[in-house]
Amino acid sequence: MADDEVIRKRLLIDGEGVGDDRRITTLMKTFVKWCNSTDDDNDASYQKLLAQLAQCEFAMGKTEMVHAMNERETENYEKAYKEVEQSITHAYEEIATCKTNLQEAKRIRRNKQEYDALAKEITKHPERQETTRQISELEKDLNSLTETKESLVSKLELRKKQFYLLINTIHELQRMIDDEKTDEGTALSPQQSITSPGKVALMDT
């Protein structure tokens, strides 16, 4: 992409075709002069006419190269735009999954609170070996569920941050595409309206 930028700057050094109108006007004057020239001046006028025609053809080719380069850049932007859209869709899916997991974590938390209340009630009664073992197992399960819930919450927060970043990226990319198309339209419209009459005039002779 950096190489294309360098090429474009070199191609646009003429001012994006601003001098084409002057070239065509000069070419037409030279053509008329050649048509009215004497035999002595005929060859010199003809060579000058060919040189000016070559300059016009070069300017047209340069504009076509700029247009092709802009088309490639637009295609690259559109491709990147689609990739970002896919990433956003994937992020939405992951966020939906995380929300589901978060609801499950909340349910686990409610169960934990119920288990804690039950454990407190059990501890009020004389301890028994089996009851103590069950409570110990419940505590292990609850600790594991708590860790799972905390992990899910952290993952959800991370996905939210990634989603916001993707949204900002797509907005910036869209702005770049719009600016590129606007610049291209401004550069090409004058060129097309000037070149066509010149071509018709040459073909008629």
From Swiss-Prot:
Q: Which GO CC annotations does the UniProt entry carry? A: cytoplasm; nuclear speck; THO complex part of transcription export complex
**A GO BP term, please?**
mRNA processing
The region annotated as signal peptide is none
Cellular localization per UniProt: Cytoplasm; Nucleus; Nucleus speckle
> Mind listing the UniProt keywords for this protein, alphabetically?
Coiled coil, Cytoplasm, Nucleus
Between which residues do disulfide bridges form? none
Name of the protein described by the UniProt record: THO complex subunit 7 homolog
Task: Record the organism.
Answer: Nematostella vectensis (Starlet sea anemone)
Primary gene name: thoc7
